[in-house]
């Protein structure tokens, strides 16, 4: 019996679902090549990697569940800490920005800033107290901070960890998706993904749904296992000209392989790029001690 072990550690879930449901988006797979000509693409040698690349990421944490009292009624909320930052790689890697913010996310109209011994939680309104709505409000605030920090630095290529949605306005931004839960390609075009070699990409395709974006798949080096091992999906704004997004896809394919992580150093190798992994660790460190903040909140509520 022959078998292979996935380098992506099991405690992070599966990088690729065993059965990928079809997307509800409309896909135009003939942006760069017609369907019959689909095959793996190696970036041309005349498409060198950009000398300056900015990597951005954000992290968040719920510090406590909160109930805001209003007479006999109570309204739910969350006290949360979130952070965003950017790493500039221009021959060396440097954290060029990192900010931490906190908030009381709630729909309670009578909510006030919560003052603790070490920190405070200003009120950040949410449309309702539904847990999913509160979580989305937190995610949106983190995304807004990430956009602000990314736009403050001049780099021809900005790698955004996660989907591009909401961050299309950042010049040079490319969404970087490490895991796969939906199938955007079918038939012979999907089979091209399995045929990718290290550093190769698929042709660019266009996805149209509630928002439109260009996309392509790329295989990073150091991947073993199933046909999707080491495969990431990239997204670019649909506002790009076709020729520009093809050049961008080539630049990304030329740039990212050297940043791919190794299994003995990162449990999410090779998809968890070194600059993003390092930035995530730094941002989580800056969130502060969760147990201390929880105690502070309990004291403030007493």
Region spans (language model):
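Adenosine ribonucleotide-centric catalytic and binding domains
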Residues: 59, 63-102
């Amino acid at each position: 019996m022959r078998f292979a072990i996935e380098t992506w550690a099991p405690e992070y879930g599966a990088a690729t679902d065993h059965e990928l449901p079809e997307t509800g988006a409309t896909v135009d797979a003939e942006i760069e090549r017609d369907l019959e000509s689909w095959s793996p693409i190696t970036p041309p040698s005349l498409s060198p990697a950009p000398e300056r690349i900015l990597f951005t990421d954000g992290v968040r944490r719920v510090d406590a569940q909160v109930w805001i009292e209003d007479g006999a009624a109570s309204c739910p909320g969350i006290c949360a800490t979130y952070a965003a930052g950017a790493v500039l790689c221009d021959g060396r890697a440097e954290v060029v920005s990192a900010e931490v913010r906190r908030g009381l996310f709630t729909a309670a109209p009578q909510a006030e800033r919560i003052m603790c011994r070490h920190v405070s939680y200003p009120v950040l309104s949410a449309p309702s107290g539904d847990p999913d709505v509160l979580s989305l409000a937190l995610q949106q605030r983190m995304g807004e901070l990430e956009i602000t920090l990314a736009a403050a630095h001049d780099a021809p290529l900005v790698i955004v960890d996660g989907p591009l949605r909401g961050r299309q306005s950042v010049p040079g931004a490319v969404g970087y998706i490490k895991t796969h839960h939906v199938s955007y390609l079918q038939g012979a075009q999907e089979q091209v993904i399995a045929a990718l070699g290290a550093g190769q990409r698929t042709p660019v395709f266009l996805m149209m749904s509630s928002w439109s974006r260009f996309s392509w798949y790329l295989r990073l080096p150091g991947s073993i296992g199933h046909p999707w091992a080491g495969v990431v999906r990239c997204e670019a704004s649909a506002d790009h000209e076709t020729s520009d997004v093809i050049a961008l896809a080539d630049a990304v394919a030329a740039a990212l392989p050297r940043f791919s992580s190794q299994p003995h150093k990162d449990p999410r190798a090779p998809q968890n790029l070194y600059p993003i992994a390092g930035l995530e660790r730094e941002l989580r460190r800056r969130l502060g001690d969760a147990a201390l903040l929880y105690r502070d909140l309990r004291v403030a509520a007493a």
